Amino acid sequence: MACRIIEQYRHLKIFGIKITPHFHDVTEGLVTILEESGFSVYEETNRETSKDTSRMLRAGAIKVYFAKVTDTTLEEAFFEILEHIPSKAPIICESPALRNYIEPGLFIIMDSPGINKDKDICHLQKLPHVVFNMDNIGMIQPLPVTFQNNKWTCNK
């Protein structure tokens, strides 16, 4: 979904962000911005991998940032990334846990009835959000998402 929105609005010069609690090895193309105790922030420069950050670049994001965080450093890492993004720039951020700290312009939950869900997102579903179904999202052209007045909205 993130890549679909980026591709649809690539002319807006969107910045992508991916935040994960998984501390995988650094891959080729990740340029270190900051490494602190509990989190690391990188800029993705490799468009050729199957990682979400590379896919965001291929979809048309002007820059993509990647952070590895713990629960206690997530917010700090996010604000570090924002230091590298112009104010009022459109941002697509993939991080369900960030929703516990930040009120986004639009929070999208992807639903797929046929897939076993490993993550418990009941607490996120109680917050304002929009749900898209993964089984039929490919048929929706264009996506009912817009960026107006420096804010993402959905006219679903």
Model-derived regions: residue spans:
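N-terminal phosphate/diphosphate-binding loop that engages ATP/GTP or pyrophosphate donors
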Residues: 3-69
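Short, ordered loop/turn segments at secondary-structure junctions
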Residues: 19-22, 69-70, 96-97, 135-137
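Conserved protein kinase catalytic core
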Residues: 24, 74, 100
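Short, well-ordered secondary-structure micro-motifs
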Residues: 27-30, 77, 103
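Short secondary-structure boundary/capping elements
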Residues: 47-48, 73, 90, 116
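Short acidic active-site motifs
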Residues: 52, 77, 120
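Active-site rim loops that border cofactor/substrate pockets in soluble metabolic enzymes
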Residues: 61-87
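Conserved catalytic-core segment of NTP-binding enzymes
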Residues: 83-90, 95-156
